Amino acid sequence: MKSVGLITEYNPFHNGHLYHAQQSKLQSDAEISIAIMSGNFVMRGEPAIYNKFLRTKMALSGVDLVVELPAIASLSSSDYFATFAIKVAHYLDIDTIAFGSEINDISRLENVASNINSLEQSSYFQDLIKQGNSYAKIVHDLIDDQQVLRSPNNILGVAYIKAISNIAPTIKRIAIQRQSTAHHDQEIKHDNFASGSAIRHALLNKENTWKDVVPADIKHLYETPHLLKKQTFNFIKYNILSRSSEELSHIYTMSEGFEHRLKSNIQNAQDFDTYMSLIKTKRFTYTHIQRVLMQILLNINKSDFDDEIRGVRILGMNQRGQQYLKYLKKQFPNRLYVTNINKESASLLKNEIKATHIYNLISGQRANDFNTPVIINKKN
């Protein structure tokens, strides 16, 4: 079965995602679409607005199979996020990766990716890093086509292309142009399409404008948001107060002694936004700092990093997805495709299970990896 992979967060799923899924299948001539989706925490360093099980139900209105991107990858920068996602795609025997982009020019994106790859492998690049220059500054100063690198989707697209070139060069790639909205738009300005940011803003402010920009058949799933970033603060504060700086230094992307800044400012903050204003620094982006805080919340340490894919968690599927899963199990009998958690898979998925428990602890949700079977959509 010819397959196309979509690397996603669906936070939440909307008409733009449905368009992307439809165009991905059409342009790749694929029989099946597979979403590699972040779980309960997302790349911007926040909990997802709805839990992964509800977002899987939403996603199955547009794709055939949904698998979980591990938490450590979901809370990583674009390069590692992309690298791990492409490894998952390769594990799933995906033929084509289709990603959203602000430009409909795959050759231009591939050219930028090739130039960055060459730069990263040069001794000059290593010298600049040793001199204390940031990766972002080096790329900004030495890569010509900066217009490509001004938008989040293009940056991720370039990261996917780089990862495919290094991990699975046989995977094809397609760029699907975004429709009518910018990634960070906070308002719904179009009759049919809106960014995830704008939809979250509408949901949080109890505005009904989101109802026009999500698929009609899943509107009923958009209930009160499950969890907001601000609700995590007291749990993060407890974790920082109860650990030493030495313990915090082992958190996955903690670096440059940032743990001391976290410790010295935590007593003076009573909410998430105030704390962020106290600890922000030119050394790190706002999003990077938020990811570090979520890694503290989930206790994801450097020792949790694993370069290998040892199994993939299946969250949901329709009939075509079930057929593809049968194909995978027959074609790759030694690979682990987890539909229900048992002793072996629980050890493998410990960070994802923990992330769900913590998400539920804060939000009051009940669905977890043990009491929620794989979601089957019988309509599509």
Swiss-Prot record:
Keywords: ATP-binding, Cytoplasm, Ligase, Nucleotide-binding, RNA-binding, tRNA processing, tRNA-binding. It catalyses: cytidine(34) in elongator tRNA(Met) + acetate + ATP = N(4)-acetylcytidine(34) in elongator tRNA(Met) + AMP + diphosphate. SUPFAM superfamilies: Nucleotidylyl transferase. One of its GO terms (molecular function) is ligase activity, forming carbon-nitrogen bonds. ATP binds at residues 7-20, 100, 153, 178. InterPro entries: Rossmann-like_a/b/a_fold, tRNA(Met)_cyd_acetate_ligase. GO terms for biological process: tRNA modification. It is an enzyme of class 6 (ligase). It is found in: Cytoplasm. GO terms for cellular component: cytoplasm. Its main location: cytoplasm. Its EC number is 6.3.4.-. Belongs to the TmcAL family. Catalyzes the formation of N(4)-acetylcytidine (ac(4)C) at the wobble position of elongator tRNA(Met), using acetate and ATP as substrates. First activates an acetate ion to form acetyladenylate (Ac-AMP) and then transfers the acetyl group to tRNA to form ac(4)C34. This is tRNA(Met) cytidine acetate ligase.
